[in-house]
């Protein structure tokens, strides 16, 4: 260090560094002080520029001198100040030493391993050794035992590492300490080594690989999970492999992996859950979860199975009992149900693409007929008289009601562009929503609220994905005939959805967490109060039915509460019973005609035409539909009072039950009223058929009997 700087420079540098003189030569301490003073003297930090320059110059000179002094040949050079005075004996010695050769003939150079042994001095130099390429994968004999997943989150407890001999020896100790392995062994494999080890806890392959790669900067390393632990270890102990070392003397045995008394863990059958969802057509995750959890209890003492009221339960309880018991303890209940529901929706998507609309409607009718067989069967709780009463009430809602329903079904099946939507318009409590709800259940579909803001409307329209029809319920607008009607933006929104209503082009429908679905928007119904409809929207309706409130229908409902309590008049089954009662068998699809015939025969046996006409008579009179067996004087007085109220307009009630108008530019042919199989009765009789409706002319009241 004394030759690096002279004394004046060294003192000056130590003063600039702020160190004691005794610290001269302590390079780390001087380096730390230098970095600290650089921040202090730097001009950008407000320091002294001259001191900064002087300190940098001296420190750089000192640093270069230290590096030069540590060179191996330092001291083999001479300095001009060290040359003796010319002419003296010292100068002669120095001169002789300066001219002395470093290599003498008596010396021999050690031979190198890389030198050629050829005798000729003109022989070809030796070729460079070729670098051996690193293997790309484990030996082929072991591939069947390994997992080949690359980007998997699966966790394992058994791994294998393929690397060089040197790194394998290092990793053997490092992995044993890092993961507290249960067992580890090192094996020879084609000039390389393989590590096989078991961990007490499960890890991802990527975690093991990342740790091992830190210790193998240049050496190759391949890390994989092991699927077949014992087969892998057994193969590593046989040729062409061999054991170098292992943590357990004697290694592993087969019974270490397959204990004799091990019990097989029973797994939930996802397939059975999916089959149940498909058979019941359940597309609600939570509903499916709740129904399947009910199967975990014994079916022998199940009240639902004893009563046999719910076919979705008692038909499947015994079959799914064992699987549901395992399902109840599963941690993936919702995931299993979600997959089952997705399968149901996928089947529905396939049907919407592959089946015709007529086939889809036929399948819907089959489902309704199955429900009717259960409802009105021996174990069912439904009363067919009440449902036929609902048919009688619905048939009085509009003239030729069965033909209206038949026309609507044809319109939905044909699905002709710009001739796909019906408009139900009328005041409050006129029957619009009742009929729309029944038609919706008859065909299958969804009801949509179009009165929402535009930013929420897209997701509301997404509900229509893969549906047979939709109902835009209670659409609000502006400029209604009555000032009491609330205003809304529903009609304006519908006017902006002309391409949806037309059905000429496919539109994009979206749901949350799902990709957009491009399809023809389904046809359907629009219900509204007496709002004004713009011409651009009116042109999208093939038929408009104007509803009017009718007092006799309202009074009949008040006296027949079961029609509303059991939602009979809003049910598609009531409309299907109406079609079975009124329409000929030939108008139904051929595949269900046999079932229609069976139901026609059953209705003929259980209901005569006179009984049905009594029901319609009671509807027109505004009394209870099933109140035709009245014997008390009070009931006779009530009936007479209702008859007097309707005496002047008995037939008018039926004639004014509603009227329908077709769109001028898009008219649709109407169907003739069905011809009844019964003969036309005389007008003098109390109940008979007259132009498809009941002529309600009561016979003259007999004179009172004289008192005795």
Swiss-Prot record:
It is an enzyme of class 5 (isomerase). The modification N-acetylmethionine is found at residue 1. Residues 663-679 have a biased composition (Polar residues). PROSITE patterns: DNAJ_2, SF3_HELICASE_1, T_AG_OBD, ZF_LTAG_D1. The modification N6-acetyllysine is found at residue 697. It is found in: Host nucleus. Residues 627-708 are annotated as: C-terminal region. Phosphorylated on both serine and threonine residues. Phosphorylation on Ser-120 and Ser-123 inhibits viral replication, while phosphorylation on Thr-124 enhances replication by activating the DNA-binding domain. Phosphorylation on Thr-701 is required for binding to host FBW7gamma isoform. Dephosphorylated preferentially by PP2A on Ser-120, Ser-123, Ser-677 and perhaps Ser-679. Small t antigen inhibits the dephosphorylation by the AC form of PP2A. Residues 418-616 are annotated as: ATPase activity. A zinc finger (T-ag D1-type) spans 265-357. The keyword Nucleotide-binding applies. Residues 139-254 bind DNA. GO terms for molecular function: ATP binding; ATP hydrolysis activity; DNA replication origin binding; double-stranded DNA binding; helicase activity; identical protein binding; single-stranded DNA binding; zinc ion binding. Keywords: Acetylation, Activator, ATP-binding, DNA replication, DNA-binding, Early protein, G1/S host cell cycle checkpoint dysregulation by virus, Glycoprotein, Helicase, Host nucleus, Host-virus interaction, Hydrolase, Inhibition of host innate immune response by virus, Inhibition of host interferon signaling pathway by virus, Inhibition of host JAK1 by virus, Interferon antiviral system evasion, Isomerase, Magnesium, Metal-binding, Modulation of host cell cycle by virus, Modulation of host E3 ubiquitin ligases by virus, Modulation of host ubiquitin pathway by virus, Nucleotide-binding, Oncogene, Phosphoprotein, Transcription, Transcription regulation, Viral immunoevasion, Zinc, Zinc-finger. Residues 109-134, 630-685 are annotated as: Disordered. ATP binds at residues 426-433. Gene3D superfamilies: 3.40.1310.20, DnaJ domain, Large T antigen, SV40, domain 3, P-loop containing nucleotide triphosphate hydrolases, Zinc finger, large T-antigen D1 domain. InterPro entries: DnaJ_domain (IPR001623), Helicase_SF3_DNA-vir (IPR014015), J_dom_sf (IPR036869), Lg_T_Ag_polyomavir (IPR016392), Lg_T_Ag_Polyomavir_C (IPR010932), P-loop_NTPase (IPR027417), T_Ag_DNA-bd (IPR003133), Znf_lg_T-Ag_D1-typ (IPR017910). A motif (Nuclear localization signal) lies at residues 125-132. Residues 12-75 form the J domain. Its EC number is 5.6.2.4. The sequence shown is that of strain 776. The J domain is essential for multiple viral activities, including virion assembly, viral DNA replication, transformation and transcriptional activation. Isoform large T antigen is a key early protein essential for both driving viral replication and inducing cellular transformation. Plays a role in viral genome replication by driving entry of quiescent cells into the cell cycle and by autoregulating the synthesis of viral early mRNA. Displays highly oncogenic activities by corrupting the host cellular checkpoint mechanisms that guard cell division and the transcription, replication, and repair of DNA. Participates in the modulation of cellular gene expression preceeding viral DNA replication. Isoform 17kT antigen targets host RBL2 for degradation and promotes cell proliferation. Transactivates host cyclin A promoter through its J domain. Isoform large T antigen forms homohexamers in the presence of ATP. Interacts with host HDAC1. Interacts (via LXCXE domain) with host RB1; the interaction induces the aberrant dissociation of RB1-E2F1 complex thereby disrupting RB1's activity. Interacts (via LXCXE domain) with host pRB-related proteins RBL1 and RBL2. Interacts (via C-terminus) with host TOP1 and POLA1 allowing DNA replication. Interacts with host TP53, inhibiting TP53 binding to DNA. Interacts with host preinitiation complex components TBP, TFIIA and TFIID to regulate transcription initiation. This is Large T antigen. It comes from Simian virus 40 (SV40).
């Amino acid at each position: 260090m004394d030759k690096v700087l002279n004394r004046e420079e060294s003192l000056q540098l130590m003063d600039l560094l702020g160190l004691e003189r005794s610290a001269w030569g302590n390079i780390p301490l001087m380096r730390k002080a230098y970095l600290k003073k650089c921040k202090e003297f730097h001009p950008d930090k407000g320091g002294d520029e001259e001191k900064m320059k002087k300190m940098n110059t001296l420190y750089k000179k000192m640093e270069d001198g230290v590096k030069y002094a540590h060179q191996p040949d330092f001291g083999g050079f001479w300095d001009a100040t060290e040359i003796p005075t010319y002419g003296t004996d010292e100068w002669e010695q120095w001169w002789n030493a300066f001219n002395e050769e470093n290599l003498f003939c008596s010396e021999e150079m050690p031979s190198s391993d890389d030198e050629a042994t050829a005798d000729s001095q003109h022989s070809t130099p030796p070729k460079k050794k070729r670098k051996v390429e690193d293997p790309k994968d484990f030996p082929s004999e072991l591939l069947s035992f390994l997992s080949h997943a690359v980007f998997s989150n699966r966790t394992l407890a058994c791994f294998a590492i393929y690397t060089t001999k040197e790194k394998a020896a290092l990793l053997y100790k490092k992995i044993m300490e890092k993961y507290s392995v249960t067992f580890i062994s090192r094996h020879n494999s084609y000039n390389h080594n393989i590590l096989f080890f078991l961990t007490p806890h499960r890890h991802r392959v990527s975690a093991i690989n990342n740790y091992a790669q830190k210790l193998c900067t240049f050496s190759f390393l391949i890390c994989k999970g092991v699927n077949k632990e014992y087969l892998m270890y057994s193969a590593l102990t046989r040729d062409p492999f061999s054991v170098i070392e292992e943590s357990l003397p004697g290694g592993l045995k087969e019974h270490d992996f397959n204990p004799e008394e091990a019990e097989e863990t029973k797994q939930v059958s996802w397939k059975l859950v999916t089959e149940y969802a498909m058979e019941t057509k359940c597309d609600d995750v939570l509903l499916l979860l709740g129904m399947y959890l009910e199967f975990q209890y014994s079916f022998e003492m199940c009240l639902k199975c004893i009563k046999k009221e719910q076919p979705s339960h008692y038909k499947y309880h015994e079959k799914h009992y064992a699987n549901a018991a395992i399902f109840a303890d599963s941690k993936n209940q919702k995931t299993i149900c979600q997959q089952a529901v997705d399968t149901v929706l996928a089947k529905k998507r396939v049907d919407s693409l592959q089946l015709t609309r007529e086939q889809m409607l036929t399948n819907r009718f089959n489902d309704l007929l199955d429900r009717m067989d259960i409802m009105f069967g021996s174990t069912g709780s439904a009363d067919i008289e009440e449902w036929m009463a609902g048919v009688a009430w619905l048939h009085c809602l509009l003239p030729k009601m069965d033909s209206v329903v038949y026309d609507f079904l044809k319109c939905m099946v044909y699905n002709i562009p710009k001739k796909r939507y019906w408009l139900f318009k009328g005041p409050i409590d006129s029957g619009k929503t009742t009929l729309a709800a029944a038609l919706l259940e008859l065909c299958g579909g969804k009801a949509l609220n179009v009165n929402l803001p535009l930013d929420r409307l897209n997701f509301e329209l997404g509900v229509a994905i893969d549906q047979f029809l939709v109902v835009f319920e209670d659409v609000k607008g502006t400029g209604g005939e009555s000032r009491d009607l609330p205003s809304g933006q529903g009609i304006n929104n519908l006017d902006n959805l002309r391409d949806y209503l037309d059905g000429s082009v496919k539109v994009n429908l979206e749901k949350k967490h799902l990709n957009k679905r491009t399809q023809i928007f389904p046809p359907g119904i629009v219900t509204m109060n007496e709002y004004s409809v713009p011409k651009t929207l009116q042109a999208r309706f093939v038929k408009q039915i104007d509803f009017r409130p009718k007092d006799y229908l309202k009074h009949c409902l008040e006296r027949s509460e079961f029609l509303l309590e059991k939602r009979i008049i809003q049910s598609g089954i009531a409309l299907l019973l109406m079609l079975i009662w009124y329409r000929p068998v030939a108008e139904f699809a051929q595949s269900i005609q046999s079932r229609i015939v069976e139901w026609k025969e059953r209705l003929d046996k259980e209901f005569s035409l006179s009984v049905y006409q009594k029901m319609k008579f009671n509807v027109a009179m505004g009394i209870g539909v099933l109140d035709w067996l009245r014997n008390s004087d009070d009931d006779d007085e009530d009936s007479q009072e209702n008859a007097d109220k309707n005496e002047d307009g008995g037939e008018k009630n039926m004639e004014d039950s509603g009227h329908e108008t077709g769109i001028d530019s898009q008219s649709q042919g109407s169907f003739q009223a069905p011809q009844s199989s019964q003969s036309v009765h005389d007008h003098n009789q109390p109940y008979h058929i007259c132009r498809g409706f009941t002529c309600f002319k009561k016979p003259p009241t007999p004179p009172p009997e004289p008192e005795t």
